Amino acid sequence: MSESGHSQPGLYGIERRRRWKEPGSGGPQNLSGPGGRERDYIAPWERERRDASEETSTSVMQKTPIILSKPPAERSKQPPPPTAPAAPPAPAPLEKPIVLMKPREEGKGPVAVTGASTPEGTAPPPPAAPAPPKGEKEGQRPTQPVYQIQNRGMGTAAPAAMDPVVGQAKLLPPERMKHSIKLVDDQMNWCDSAIEYLLDQTDVLVVGVLGLQGTGKSMVMSLLSANTPEEDQRTYVFRAQSAEMKERGGNQTSGIDFFITQERIVFLDTQPILSPSILDHLINNDRKLPPEYNLPHTYVEMQSLQIAAFLFTVCHVVIVVQDWFTDLSLYRFLQTAEMVKPSTPSPSHESSSSSGSDEGTEYYPHLVFLQNKARREDFCPRKLRQMHLMIDQLMAHSHLRYKGTLSMLQCNVFPGLPPDFLDSEVNLFLVPFMDSEAESENPPRAGPGSSPLFSLLPGYRGHPSFQSLVSKLRSQVMSMARPQLSHTILTEKNWFHYAARIWDGVRKSSALAEYSRLLA
């Protein structure tokens, strides 16, 4: 500044003047006033300092609002970006695992929970898109156990890859047996081939047969199971005794034969009890006996007792076939077999301890006496009453169910007899000769002096036809009650394993061993 008070151009530039003029409120500034120049000179520096401090303070204060003010500005200018922020979906996965765990227990509801978890109104649509597939997966979850069960039953293939033909084959009935197979061979060993024909169902009836040699056990079992009298005996499921075998005096069946029908009825045909042909085979062929038996006839009797005791334990019905009335040794044998019969296995838990005496829990089958090859006079009512009375007296002390389950009077075999004709009716059934049908169909012709009318009448038989009696016997046997063999309900396969265990126990029975020592 010069002495005259004029400002030098170098010191006061255009910017200085602008900076001095800018803060003014308006109008020219008075520079000639007292103290005006000091204000003009000092105030600008202070103003610069103040401006610098204000600029720094405003810059610091403006940085934070600028950063915070940018998102609202962008949100106002660009509405689509609300969906763009990827930061909000980040917490969503943290909540989704919690939401996904709940539908597994509650079933439905993942869509509603995800919709409620979104705070904004526009946000639910985006998560709603992935929610449906998750809901579908959760909806399929309850059906997974069904597919697992099908996989176990149908194989290892996936449910979608299952062949419908295979599933339909499972519903078909089992293969029909065409002939009997061995359950116990001639060496008295158990055979496991019969289990292939058994199912896992409990509605099964087991019928066994006992009888002396040549009484027609195999023929009766074949007629009851699958064959008819008109068929050739060589095609029977249980092979009957051939003419050559009859001439030699031998037995056709050895061990125990097994056959099951489509109606799930098991038939067990056995070798003859107390058979002389088996005894002759042991003696003449020098067959070695087990060490516990010293004499051949003792071994034959023990074999017969083992088979009878086995049938009394695993059968619902046991048919005793005889071809004449009657053999007292047969009834003595039945009482002995009942004595050595193995007891019913007790349950694992002692819940049946309050059932009463041991006789109440012990199992005994139905016993049917079948008089095969009956003659005409055997069908006489007076003779019929005598037979019933004698059997009742011989079996009076037996626990076997030998009465009250089969009746010839109720099936109309004797239409003229009242139901109370027999005082004590036992399970007795009469079947005539099978060959008598051919004789009755071809009666002898009348002589030349007789009336031709008699030649047209059928011959008198004195009893119903063979086919009719076999049909009545079959219907009564198959309609018998099926008591529980053990303390638990057995399926067909369970019965097979139960029978195998019983047979092993019979072979090792201490009661039979003690009885064999008494016979020796």
From Swiss-Prot:
One Gene Ontology MF term: identical protein binding
N-acetylserine modified-residue sites: 2
A biological process term (GO) from this entry: negative regulation of apoptotic process
Biased composition range(s): Low complexity: 342-357
Positions where Phosphoserine occurs in the chain: 2, 4, 7, 32, 53, 451
Cellular component terms (Gene Ontology): cytosol
Keywords assigned: Acetylation, Intellectual disability, Nonsense-mediated mRNA decay, Phosphoprotein
Family: Belongs to the SMG9 family.
Subunit structure: Self-associates to form homodimers and forms heterodimers with SMG8; these assembly forms may represent SMG1C intermediate forms. Component of the SMG1C complex composed of SMG1, SMG8 and SMG9. Interacts with DHX34; the interaction is RNA-independent.
Protein name: Nonsense-mediated mRNA decay factor SMG9
Upper lineage: Eukaryota, Metazoa, Chordata, Craniata, Vertebrata
Gene (UniProt): SMG9
